[in-house]
């Protein structure tokens, strides 16, 4: 199914690129960059959750227009990633320089006027905006052409929730960084809004909304998705500190350098306060500063030594098991349960 989602994206993006040919080669280059970013990587998790949300309440396969609707989640994800890299000043994404760095390099290579860095940031903002606008266009088009009025209203409600929660979660994330928030509760709230809702809960509900009026199933997916989505984010937190850059495509320790207030970091500070005041001081004074590779390794050692990594793994396991227990009792068909169980294990235990 991931391949079918990619095919839908490819056809849509190629069509939009052809339709915009009259706008000239520079804009064509921006669209080509979006094509490359969307088609060149990603696990298609969000459209896959939408697909199984559909199958939870419908026995028939979704038609191509509905698959295109689910594919819009991948464009929304591209928007979030490009802008997240800007906010975090990240250098790499999926093993390549981030959009803002590539556009800054383009500016330098062509010896243009002004600041390469400012151009890079501006172009990356527009790249992300393009992904968001086209995601919205897909939803509007499919609702008008392929869904009954009641289904249209249900889908639009879920889509509005997705966008609001992603933006709200992202803002809370930067507030947490700026204020050096330390509580696990604060970090969990960010993880729920910024990641869990738009990665699992809302995609599942989008699929269900397109297929049928099943508020009972949507409510169950709210709980299932909250637990699994936070487990997904906690895995991301662990990979951000301990992951293999050759596999994740991002430098290990980026979250520590940017000062991201993840659950892993909050857990480390809380545990260090109890057992090792010197370690707690090191964490508080180092995270969010210009760290050398040696300092990243030292912080990684401290985080593991105080038990934060083990605590994160325990949380991931507990949340995943709770999500699977919720799924087991859900009034949905067995095929969807099996598909979602497999997808859940992959999401929580991935290495990239």
Curated annotation (Swiss-Prot):
<keyword id="KW-0443">Lipid metabolism</keyword>
<dbReference type="InterPro" id="IPR033749">
    <property type="entry name" value="Polyprenyl_synt_CS"/>
</dbReference>
<comment type="pathway">
    <text>Isoprenoid biosynthesis; geranyl diphosphate biosynthesis; geranyl diphosphate from dimethylallyl diphosphate and isopentenyl diphosphate: step 1/1.</text>
</comment>
<feature type="binding site">
    <location>
        <position position="84"/>
    </location>
    <ligand>
        <name>Mg(2+) 1</name>
    </ligand>
</feature>
<comment type="similarity">
    <text>Belongs to the FPP/GGPP synthase family.</text>
</comment>
<feature type="binding site">
    <location>
        <position position="94"/>
    </location>
    <ligand>
        <name>isopentenyl diphosphate</name>
    </ligand>
</feature>
<feature type="binding site">
    <location>
        <position position="77"/>
    </location>
    <ligand>
        <name>isopentenyl diphosphate</name>
    </ligand>
</feature>
<feature type="short sequence motif" description="DDXXD motif">
    <location>
        <begin position="236"/>
        <end position="240"/>
    </location>
</feature>
<feature type="binding site">
    <location>
        <position position="43"/>
    </location>
    <ligand>
        <name>isopentenyl diphosphate</name>
    </ligand>
</feature>
<comment type="pathway">
    <text>Isoprenoid biosynthesis; farnesyl diphosphate biosynthesis; farnesyl diphosphate from geranyl diphosphate and isopentenyl diphosphate.</text>
</comment>
<feature type="binding site">
    <location>
        <position position="88"/>
    </location>
    <ligand>
        <name>Mg(2+) 2</name>
    </ligand>
</feature>
<dbReference type="Pfam" id="PF00348">
    <property type="entry name" value="polyprenyl_synt"/>
</dbReference>
<feature type="binding site">
    <location>
        <position position="84"/>
    </location>
    <ligand>
        <name>Mg(2+) 2</name>
    </ligand>
</feature>
<keyword id="KW-0460">Magnesium</keyword>
<keyword id="KW-0479">Metal-binding</keyword>
<dbReference type="InterPro" id="IPR000092">
    <property type="entry name" value="Polyprenyl_synt"/>
</dbReference>
<dbReference type="GO" id="GO:0008299">
    <property type="term" value="P:isoprenoid biosynthetic process"/>
</dbReference>
<dbReference type="GO" id="GO:0046872">
    <property type="term" value="F:metal ion binding"/>
</dbReference>
<dbReference type="GO" id="GO:0004337">
    <property type="term" value="F:(2E,6E)-farnesyl diphosphate synthase activity"/>
</dbReference>
<dbReference type="GO" id="GO:0033384">
    <property type="term" value="P:geranyl diphosphate biosynthetic process"/>
</dbReference>
<feature type="binding site">
    <location>
        <position position="88"/>
    </location>
    <ligand>
        <name>Mg(2+) 1</name>
    </ligand>
</feature>
<keyword id="KW-0444">Lipid biosynthesis</keyword>
<protein>
    <recommendedName>
        <fullName>(2E,6E)-farnesyl diphosphate synthase</fullName>
        <ecNumber>2.5.1.10</ecNumber>
        <ecNumber>2.5.1.1</ecNumber>
    </recommendedName>
</protein>
<dbReference type="InterPro" id="IPR008949">
    <property type="entry name" value="Isoprenoid_synthase_dom_sf"/>
</dbReference>
<feature type="short sequence motif" description="DDXXD motif">
    <location>
        <begin position="84"/>
        <end position="88"/>
    </location>
</feature>
<dbReference type="GO" id="GO:0004161">
    <property type="term" value="F:dimethylallyltranstransferase activity"/>
</dbReference>
<dbReference type="InterPro" id="IPR054885">
    <property type="entry name" value="FPP_synthase"/>
</dbReference>
<comment type="function">
    <text>Catalyzes the sequential condensations of isopentenyl pyrophosphate (IPP) with dimethylallyl diphosphate (DMAPP) to yield geranyl diphosphate (GPP) and with GPP to yield (2E,6E)-farnesyl diphosphate (E,E-FPP).</text>
</comment>
<dbReference type="GO" id="GO:0004659">
    <property type="term" value="F:prenyltransferase activity"/>
</dbReference>
<feature type="binding site">
    <location>
        <position position="46"/>
    </location>
    <ligand>
        <name>isopentenyl diphosphate</name>
    </ligand>
</feature>
<keyword id="KW-0808">Transferase</keyword>
């Amino acid at each position: 199914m991931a391949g079918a989602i990619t095919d839908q994206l490819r056809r849509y993006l190629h069509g939009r690129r052809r339709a915009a040919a009259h706008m000239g080669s520079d804009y064509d280059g921006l669209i080509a960059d979006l094509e490359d970013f969307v088609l060149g990587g990603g696990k298609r998790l969000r459209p896959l959750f939408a697909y199984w949300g559909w199958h939870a309440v419908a026995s028939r396969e979704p038609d191509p227009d509905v698959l295109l609707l689910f594919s819009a989640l991948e464009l929304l994800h591209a928007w979030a990633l490009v802008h997240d890299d800007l906010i975090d000043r990240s250098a790499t994404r999926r093993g390549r320089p981030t959009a803002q760095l590539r556009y800054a390099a383009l500016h330098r290579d062509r010896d243009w006027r002004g600041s390469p860095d400012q151009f890079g940031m501006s172009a990356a903002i527009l790249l992300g905006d393009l992904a968001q606008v086209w995601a919205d266009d897909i939803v509007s088009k499919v609702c008008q052409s392929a869904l009954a009025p009641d289904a249209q209203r249900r889908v639009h409600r879920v889509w509005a929730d997705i966008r609001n929660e992603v933006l709200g979660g992202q803002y809370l994330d930067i507030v947490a960084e700026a204020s050096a928030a330390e509580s696990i509760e604060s970090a969990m709230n960010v993880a729920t809004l910024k990641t869990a809702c738009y990665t699992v809960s809302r995609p599942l509900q989008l699929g269900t909304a397109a297929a049928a009026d099943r508020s009972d199933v949507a409510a169950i997916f709210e709980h299932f998705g909250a637990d699994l989505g936070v487990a997904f984010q906690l895995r991301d937190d662990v990979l951000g500190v301990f992951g293999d850059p050759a596999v994740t495509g991002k430098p290990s320790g980026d979250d520590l350098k940017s000062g991201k207030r993840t659950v892993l970091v909050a857990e480390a500070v809380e545990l260090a306060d109890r057992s090792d005041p010197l370690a707690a001081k090191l964490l508080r004074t180092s995270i969010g500063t210009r760290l050398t590779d040696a300092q990243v390794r030292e912080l990684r050692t401290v985080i593991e030594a105080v038990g934060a990594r083990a605590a994160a793994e325990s949380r991931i396991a507990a949340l995943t098991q709770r999500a699977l227990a919720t799924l087991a009792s859900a009034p949905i068909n067995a095929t969807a349960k099996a598909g979602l169980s497999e997808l859940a294990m992959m999401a929580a235990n991935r290495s990239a």
